[in-house]
Amino acid sequence: MRAVGIILAGGNNNKMRELTQRRAVAAMPIAGSYRAIDFALSNMSNSHIQKVAVLTQYNARSLNEHLNSSKWWDFGRKQGGLYVFTPTITADNGYWYRGTADAIYQNLDFLKRCHEPYVIITSGDAVYKMDYNKVLEYHIAKKADITVVCRDLDQGEDATRFGILKMNENMRIENFEEKPMVANSNTISTGIYIIRRRQLIDLIEHSAEEDRYDFVTDILIRYKNLKKIYGYKIKDYWSNISTVDAYYKTNMDFLKPEVRNYFFKQLPSIYSKVTDLPPAKYNPGAVVKNSLVASGSIINGTVENSVLFKKVFVGNNCVIKNSIILNDVYLGDNTYIENCIVESRDTIRANTRHVGEDGVKVVIEKNERYAL
């Protein structure tokens, strides 16, 4: 493909509360065996993009460990490959990334060394499948300066979490508001953009000269009347995990057969780093209904409408309902978990009860397994 990829994975999201105290949003576990960034990386690979840069910053250790080998997404190649960039203090720069445009600016040498004519920019915290070649063909046909991938939200969804845009009959963007207090449209930006590489370099350098650091505010919105910026509307599944509720809903969506089949049975595939573990074990007396249970787990109790990640131990007489249990959690005997997200590497003590009565509850308990 005639494009290089950039995945923005360095942002800090306070709306994820305790879940991002240990990891970046892009490293959040999804659907039992995946990380959020796997979807963007798989889309890049399936679109035959040979060179991809991932820009990381906050709580990047877990994310960097996940990306330590590029072979899982077929980027282990002599030409191109997967590049992971973190903020670097140099003689000319002493700052962390001050925004999305600044993150690209601090790694502009990467783009200048590339030869591909186009750049695809996406975030690492969205769950979706996409062939970027179709978007690029649209971008070229429209003779656009920038193409923004967008979609219509379903009725009742909160549009104020996203950039809101309005387009004319030719799909040219006429108005763009970033996370407004009141949404005047249900068409949102998905945070996926296509732009010519030389033009991106010029816009980023010009923004840096004026101390402007945000790609949406200081480039898209600022130049919407000066540049030909078009929208490319999608209808397939897309979800951004920017809040605890959105993260919970996204994982629960994978309990729906149509969503699960779309991602895991229909080609192209979604790839992730592989961990060699035995299959989940269901001991006598275990009851599992409408749930995803990942490898390495041992089930002795009841699991209903839940997603269990790798190496989860469910004790005797435990009941888990409508919950997400992250990696390497030990649930003692006679525990009751409902409408909760249990953080990874936790020990839930026996004979305890956790219920999210007013929404999704994040459960973090002291991990006594590692106490000396």
Language-model features: locations:
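Unchanged
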Residues: M1-F254, I364-K366
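Left-handed beta-helix
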Residues: M1-V4, R198, H206-L372
